[in-house]
C-alpha cells in the first residue's frame, strides 16, 4: 500500500453552534476539541475521528492538511 496517497491530518473548524443540538452531538464536539464557533483543530485522520466527524459534519468545515 502506498502511504503517500493517504491523508494524514484533517483540519476541522466549528462553523455552527451546539446550542439546541442533541447531547451526544455536544459530547462529540467536546471529544474533537471544539467548544466555540470558529475554533479550529488539526486531528489525525483515523477511523474513530472519521466516525466522529460524520456524526457532526453539519456543524463543521472539514479540510485536508
Curated annotation (Swiss-Prot):
The family database entries (CDD domains) matched by this protein are listed as: Ribosomal_L30
Q: Name one GO molecular function term.
A: structural constituent of ribosome
User: What residue ranges carry the coiled-coil annotation?
Assistant: none
List the GO cellular component terms: cytosolic large ribosomal subunit
Task: Look up the domain of life of the source.
Answer: Bacteria
Which BP terms does GO give this entry? translation
Write down the InterPro entries for this protein, in alphabetical order: Ribo_uL30_ferredoxin-like_sf, Ribosomal_uL30_bac-type, Ribosomal_uL30_ferredoxin-like
* Subunit-structure text: Part of the 50S ribosomal subunit.
- The protein's name is Large ribosomal subunit protein uL30
Species annotation: Rickettsia bellii (strain OSU 85-389)
Q: Tell me the name of the encoding gene.
A: rpmD
Amino acid at each position: 500500500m502506498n502511504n503517500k496517497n493517504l491523508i494524514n491530518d484533517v483540519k476541522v473548524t466549528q462553523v455552527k453552534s451546539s446550542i439546541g443540538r442533541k447531547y451526544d452531538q455536544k459530547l462529540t464536539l467536546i471529544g474533537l476539541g471544539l467548544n466555540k464557533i470558529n475554533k479550529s483543530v488539526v486531528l489525525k485522520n483515523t477511523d474513530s475521528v472519521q466516525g466522529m466527524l460524520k456524526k457532526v459534519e453539519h456543524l463543521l468545515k472539514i479540510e485536508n492538511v
